[in-house]
């Protein structure tokens, strides 16, 4: 039985499962939470939950649904290079940037009082 949820986090939709690591772009509400490691967060923007054969959809979000997670640390993504060139003009520009991201682990998915966690034995 695979349990997963689709959440809306920072303008992106992520498919999350309990016990797995994910990277999310660092946005303003995350920046205040990163002062300490293992900061616990609760995400209420849950679009869909699947548990076994049951699937629940929200319009746009599910009521009484949340995803509990811990922010482990912040880091930077690999460098993205941008190269602009005008043909036949000898004009070239090369620059890049590194996007700041936060790594988090999903502890549990909750829906209507039920808690779905990992089934590690």
Swiss-Prot record:
GO terms for biological process: translation. Keywords: Chloroplast, Plastid, Ribonucleoprotein, Ribosomal protein, RNA-binding, rRNA-binding. One of its GO terms (molecular function) is structural constituent of ribosome. Its main location: plastid. HAMAP family: Ribosomal_bL21 (MF_01363). Belongs to the bacterial ribosomal protein bL21 family. Part of the 50S ribosomal subunit. This protein binds to 23S rRNA. This is Large ribosomal subunit protein bL21c. It comes from Chaetosphaeridium globosum. The gene is rpl21.
């Amino acid at each position: 039985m695979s349990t997963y949820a689709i959440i809306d986090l920072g303008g992106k939709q992520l498919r999350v499962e309990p016990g797995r690591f994910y990277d999310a772009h660092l946005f303003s509400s995350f920046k205040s939470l990163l002062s300490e490691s293992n900061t616990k967060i609760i995400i209420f923007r849950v679009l869909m939950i699947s548990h076994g054969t049951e699937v629940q959809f929200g319009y746009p979000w599910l009521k009484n649904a949340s995803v509990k997670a811990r922010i482990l640390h912040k880091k930077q993504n690999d460098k993205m290079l941008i190269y602009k060139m005008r043909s036949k003009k000898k004009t070239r520009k090369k620059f890049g940037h590194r996007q700041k991201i936060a790594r988090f682990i999903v502890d549990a998915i909750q829906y209507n009082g039920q808690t779905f966690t990992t089934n590690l034995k």
